[in-house]
Amino acid sequence: MFEKLKEKLGIAKKDEEHSGNVDVRGTSINVTANSRDFEEIATNLKISLLEADIALPVADRISNVLLKKLDDKSIRLKGDRNSVFKEAVRETIREVASVPPLDVIDNASKKSSYVIMFVGMNGTGKTTSIAKLAELFRSKGYYVVIAASDTFRAGAIEQIALHGEKIGVKVIKHQAGGDPAAVSFDAVKHASKVERSVVLIDTAGRMQNNKNLLEEMKKIKRISNPDLILLTLDALSGTDVLSQAKLFDEAVGINGYIVTKIDADAKGGCVISLLSETKKPILYIGTGQTYSDLVQFSLDWYLNRLLN
């Protein structure tokens, strides 16, 4: 996981562990160097970060902060230079990408009925993510209701209904082509009669230029009045996740993200870009196809897999 980003940051080469140098894009970083020696490194590092799917503004921040930390450390640190570099990377990403966490399970426990609306483009794993979160809530004793409000895509209602059957949760559905907002309304109304309930609203995958579907999404929000709106994003989309986040945030207001297919992403840079640029939390990441393959995200989790 994140092999490409590890390579670009120069922390994947074990043979350098005791050499005193760390390689970044063919440039040997000696952390005992003075500030003049970091100019070439800064340029190479920025290019390397861009190749690892880190957005340009974020790459600028990381390279500037990281190289300053290395320069500061070079004055006083001796020993394992690779460890010094890794610690500088850890401190830099914390500084650039730290966002206050959002615990959806804790938030849901404070209301008798909690409503979550899911949005995202086709192919990002939205429906599967809903099923995974439904299983998580069910396992914690919540009464879970899924609203099959994706009434446009062929087979979408059947797909979410099958998930509900496998998990053992209620699915509210209407006929194909029906009013998505009406489905969400019925689901919220049904759940409101049960204490400790959670409503998970599926919506149609919105293409970025489909204004009609975006308006329908706004209508669902008005009708269901969700406590939380989550955007599902595919880690393999790279820096395009930023344009998707901007689109949906402008349309309905996003509270956080579920990032899917993280297990298949060798680059890993989109996570840093997303946190740094939007300042909104990643709640969960998808690490596989089973219902249990949903991991609560934390920056520590990310850094441990990147640096260890």
Language-model features and meaning:
Residues M1-M117, S139-V145, K166:
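Non-catalytic terminal/linker segments enriched in charged/polar, low-complexity residues
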Residues L102-N308:
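P-loop/Walker A NTP-binding module and the surrounding RecA-like catalytic core of P-loop NTPases
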